[in-house]
Amino acid sequence: MPSLKDLKNRIGSVKNTRKITKAMQMVAAAKLRRAQEAAEAARPYADRMAAVMAGLTAAAAGSDMAPRLLAGTGEDRRHLLVVMTSERGLAGGFNSSIVKLARLRLQELQAQGKQVSILTVGKKGREQLKREYGDLFVNHVDLSEVKRIGYDNARAIADEILDRFDNGEFDVATLFYNRFESVISQVPTARQVIPAVIEEGEAGASSLYDYEPDENAILNDLLPRSVATQVFAALLENAASEQGARMTAMDNATRNAGDMIDRLTTVYNRSRQAAITKELIEIISGAEAL
C-alpha cells in the first residue's frame, strides 16, 4: 500500500498533467478552426481545377502528343510514395493510420515485384518508416519551422516530385495523407497524382468546350499546377486532421486524468481514515491500560 505522502505526490503530479493536456486541447481547438477553414476554402478551387483538367484530358488522352504527366511513362514498375504526417506527436492515431496505409501499399507493391521509393513530409512518418525501409528513402521534407502551411510549401514539394519524374526516377507517384471529415473523423487517403487520374463523370461534363490553344499546350502548363494544387490540398487536409486528432486525444487524456485523480483521492481518503482510526485505537488501548 502506498504511503499517504506517495499518494499525495501522485495526485499532484496527475493534476499538473491534466493542466498540460487541457491547455494543449484548447490550443488545438484554436488551431483547428483556422486549419479547417483553410482546408474547406481550398476544396472548391481543387474541385474546379479537377473539372477543367477533366475537359482537357478527355480530348488529349488519346493523342500521341499527350503530356507525360497525363500519359505516364508507359510503365508501372517504379512507384514513389509521398507520405505526409505531422512534425509533432500527441495526436492519437493520426500518424500511425497514415503510416499503416502507406506500409500496406508498399508491401503490396513489393509483392508484385515493383520498385518503391519513399519521400516523407513530417518527422513522425519518417521515424516510423525509416526503421523498416530506410534504404527506400529518397528525401525528407522538414516543415517543423513552418507555422502556417502556404502554397509555397506545397509548390516546393511538388517541384521536387516533378523533378524526380523528369529525371526518370519513378513511373507513378501517390500521396498519402489524412482527409479531414470532422473533429473525430480523419480518413487515411491515398491519391495518385502522376500520371494524372481523371474521373469519368468530370471528363464528360467538361469535354463540350473547345480550347485555344490546343488541349496539349494548355495541359503542359496546367498539369504541374495541378500537382502543386493537389499537394497543397493534401497538406491543408492533413493540418486540419492533425489538430482535430490532437484535440480529441488531449480531451480524452484530460478526462482520464480526472478519473485517475478521483480514484487516487478515494484511495488517499480511505488510507488517511484508516490511519486515523488506527491512531484512535492505539490511544484508547493505551488509556485502558492505565
UniProtKB/Swiss-Prot annotation:
Disulfide bonds, paired cysteine numbers: none
Subunit structure: F-type ATPases have 2 components, CF(1) - the catalytic core - and CF(0) - the membrane proton channel. CF(1) has five subunits: alpha(3), beta(3), gamma(1), delta(1), epsilon(1). CF(0) has three main subunits: a, b and c.
Family: Belongs to the ATPase gamma chain family.
Organism of provenance: Paracoccus denitrificans (strain Pd 1222)
Organism ancestry: Bacteria, Pseudomonadati, Pseudomonadota, Alphaproteobacteria, Rhodobacterales
Keyword Ion transport recorded: yes
Keyword Hydrolase: no
InterPro entries the UniProt entry points to: ATP_synth_F1_ATPase_gsu, ATP_synth_F1_gsu, ATP_synth_F1_gsu_CS
Protein name as catalogued: ATP synthase gamma chain
CDD domains hit by this protein: F1-ATPase_gamma
GO biological process per UniProt: proton motive force-driven plasma membrane ATP synthesis
Domain of life: Bacteria
